[in-house]
Amino acid sequence: MTRPFVMGLTGSIGMGKSAVALMLREMGVPVFDADAAVHQLQGPRGPLLPAIEAAFPGTTGPEGVKRQDLGARVFGDADALRRLEAIVHPAVARMREAFMIEHMGEPLVVFDIPLLFEKGHGKDLDAVMVVSAPAEVQRQRVLARPGMTVEKFAHILSLQVPDAEKRARADYVIDTGLTLAETEGQVAELVRAIREKNPRG
């Protein structure tokens, strides 16, 4: 059975990563969403709730992890963050492995990983796709979000690898500063090329 070509998908805040992930799904490409996996693990009756509650008492409830409370406990505390990651990361890795097994005959699978470069998650990937748009487009998109401020946006950017560096480290760059149709055309061409090189097995 053919092993899929494994593509990482990433990009800074406001660059259109979610839109590109949706395009890929609509083209029949299996996409593993790392953020969604974490939400599932930490949501109502999530399998990680007992371990998180034991490590950080008072941060979980019937609806799952109390994200603000847990965030306050680990923000600025490197040791606490390491303890949380030691609980979460192995569980996400197991979900990734199950996803790969499920889609082993596919020509292409994509792992949607927001902090791919920041957390060093690129080791098991065949290539990385970065979504990018001009800085002013990014700024307009992000500041249009409910509750977003210039200060919050600046803080988030300070924690992320700069867009220019992501572009330089990418194997493929998708320009999302264009129309949706033009962006979709770029994605479709890339998917077609990979499927031709790595047919379904």
UniProtKB/Swiss-Prot annotation:
Residues 6-201 form the DPCK domain. The keyword ATP-binding applies. GO terms for molecular function: ATP binding; dephospho-CoA kinase activity. GO terms for cellular component: cytoplasm. It catalyses: 3'-dephospho-CoA + ATP = ADP + CoA + H(+). Pathway: Cofactor biosynthesis; coenzyme A biosynthesis; CoA from (R)-pantothenate: step 5/5. It is found in: Cytoplasm. Transmembrane segments: none annotated. InterPro entries: Depp_CoAkinase, P-loop_NTPase. Its EC number is 2.7.1.24. ATP binds at residues 14-19. Belongs to the CoaE family. PANTHER family: BIFUNCTIONAL COENZYME A SYNTHASE-RELATED, DEPHOSPHO-COA KINASE-RELATED. Catalyzes the phosphorylation of the 3'-hydroxyl group of dephosphocoenzyme A to form coenzyme A. This is Dephospho-CoA kinase.
